[in-house]
Amino acid sequence: MQSVFNATRVSAVVGGKEIILETGRLANQAHGAVWVQCGGTVVLVTACTQPLERDMGFFPLTVDYSEKMYAAGRIPGSFFRREIGRPSERETLVSRLIDRPVRPLFTKGFRDEVQILANVISADQENDSDVLAVTGASAALSISPIPFEGPVAGARIGRVNGEFVLNPTMKEMEASDLAIVIAASRDSVVMVEGEAHFVPEDVIVAALEWAHKEIQPLIDAQLKLMELVGKAKMAVTPPVENAELKARVAELATTELDAALRIPEKMARKDARKAVKEKVLEALLADPALAENANLGREVGDMLGSLEKVLVRRRILKEGTRIDGRDTKTVRPILIEAGLLPRAHGSALFSRGETKSLVVATLGSSTDSQRMDSLVGDVTKKFMLHYNFPPYSVGEVKMSRVSRREIGHGALAEKALKPVLPQDDSFPFTLRVVAETMESNGSSSMAAVCGGSLSLMDAGVPVTAPVAGVAMGLIKEEGEYLVLTDILGDEDALGDMDFKIAGTAEGITAVQMDIKITGLPTDVMARAMAQAREARLHILAEMAKVLEAPRTELSKYAPQHAEVFVNPDVIRIIIGPGGKNIKAITAATGASIDIEDSGKVSIFAPTYEAMEMAREMVQYYDQRAELGKNYVGKVRKVLEIGAIVEILPNLEALVHISQLDTNRVEQAGDVARLGEDMTVKVIEINGDRIRASRKAVLLEEQGVEWNPEDTARPSGPPRDRGDRGDRGGRGDRGGDRRGGDRGGRGGDRGRGGDRR
């Protein structure tokens, strides 16, 4: 559609699809605004900056991704019918996906506040918006005056029938064994995030290399847009470093700081570093000129941080020795305990060095699944992994609330474990795994993966294979790359990469890579993945010593499950008016009941006895009448020809007046009274029509043989009816007045057939 606004547009063909980058139509007062479109999916990304009154000591970047429900022609399901409240889990994860590749690319020393907003304003439910938002953020920053050293582009890699697909459609993703989001610059990959179905390391590397080449047109398009509308970048004046103070700090601290950084224990090392800082400050404050510097404490802290980085990295590169004394490939000591929580369905305590995670698995019913409102409609999740990082895990005091980091780590661990879970209806339970970080000194999310796998096996969940994960680090100096296995928290902070890789012995199930340098060659990634495989196999071997396979039975405290198939016509009866019947079953048994339109009823109960009771109560509403069986029913209607008796829920039988008693009955109401119980025998089933007899029951009670072939004939001699004289003009009425060949009073009497 041709715009009447003065817009500038460029495009690139990537993965066989045109991706449009446009600016000038919307949000022109933003410092940078780009409309990114692929098919019918459109994301508007804006970038704005403003100076701060004082230096915060860090770069204040905020990224928020939002999905507007109108984009898919939907109205929000909230009470106020608008997008309010906290972001959804997906919105949080995509916000992180945008943040991670762009954050390292801001010019060093730039400390102004920056806000990136990505709003999905059109969604065709075919082309995913997340990778468009990554590219849009880079484009908005690139054309803005914000000092950003991009561009980068984002794309998703799929693999269908062994062939790589770039930016696959949502339909293609259903058949893909790979789903990796990559962000890359002209020269190298800067971010990786995704999941795989037991894919080998070499395939992952090949996918990254292939995708890096394929997304280059998006880099070209952004450079073209910069040429057309790009603004001059803001000048960044890096803070002037006090060389004299830096030299003095190094002189005072180097020896003792190096010794402190050789202490293996995290908290002892932290205390020693703190003591070094205090000693240095004490010596410096003795100088009256320095004592007047209000920022001395922060400046010294920054200088000591830089010195720590130099000392640690130099020792690793020159000596091959890390902070805790390990070489570059050794995994920290592993300790595992399974089943330590007596009433939990499954539990495991996984410890790797000073990182420890208590992971608990819980089985629930299908009604416990998570239902989410999204652009593609209502989405249901039957597996959830929640990662918690309480402040006590690192000896700190903080507000205890779920952070974006916790959501991101939980999502990564969830991706890692999902491929090994039962994929069919044979395992109908909802699963929730909670990873409580007890201690943290690096790689706590991968501890959640290992502990999560063990807790599921402890619960008896039939996973196809154990899963383990490890975090890899990197030291890069003067073109030399050194990969570190199982990094510590300090190595994460002082190093150049955090590359988390999880999988089974067969292959990879989840990856996540963040770097602090401008890019990473794929051959270095290949080396890191090969080294990670060695570590993963070692960890899996340690896990197998404690729990080699899932327990043969589910936890006795897990819900008991049964499936019942009922006639779909009785579903409304099982539910009852206003849910009366199903609520009664739930109240009596404590069971959770899920009924499908097909007639499949899933029962989840706290005990086996409760499950059986719930099953019987459900089946009670789906009973079929049996010929010759006695039933105690309620009289629902009294008619001229007899009574209607409800012998089973919503199943009624006609008791003809001739079958109400062993003696002649003149009026049905003499025997049958509305709402009273009546015991009857089913004597005929003809499709949906059922006939029953009270007389047959009475005869059986008297020990008199009842002849089902003569259901209308009363027992005993007929009553003396006296001389009734000539009835005149009515002819032969076909035998016995009480039935005989008349077929009972239900025959054709010229009143519309059977009068049931």
From Swiss-Prot:
This is Polyribonucleotide nucleotidyltransferase. Keywords: Cytoplasm, Magnesium, Metal-binding, Nucleotidyltransferase, RNA-binding, Transferase. CDD domains: KH-I_PNPase, RNase_PH_PNPase_1, RNase_PH_PNPase_2. It comes from Nitratidesulfovibrio vulgaris (strain DSM 19637 / Miyazaki F). Residues 703-756 are annotated as: Disordered. InterPro entries: ExoRNase_PH_dom1, ExoRNase_PH_dom2, ExoRNase_PH_dom2_sf, KH_dom, KH_dom_type_1, KH_dom_type_1_sf, NA-bd_OB-fold, PNPase. Residues 718-756 have a biased composition (Basic and acidic residues). Its EC number is 2.7.7.8. One of its GO terms (cellular component) is cytosol. Belongs to the polyribonucleotide nucleotidyltransferase family. SUPFAM superfamilies: Eukaryotic type KH-domain (KH-domain type I), Nucleic acid-binding proteins, Polynucleotide phosphorylase/guanosine pentaphosphate synthase (PNPase/GPSI), domain 3, Ribonuclease PH domain 2-like, Ribosomal protein S5 domain 2-like. Disulfide bonds: none annotated. Its cofactor is Mg(2+). PANTHER family: POLYRIBONUCLEOTIDE NUCLEOTIDYLTRANSFERASE, POLYRIBONUCLEOTIDE NUCLEOTIDYLTRANSFERASE 1, MITOCHONDRIAL. SMART domains: KH, S1. It is found in: Cytoplasm. Residues 628-702 form the S1 motif domain. The keyword Repeat does not apply. Residues 559-618 form the KH domain. It comes from the Bacteria.
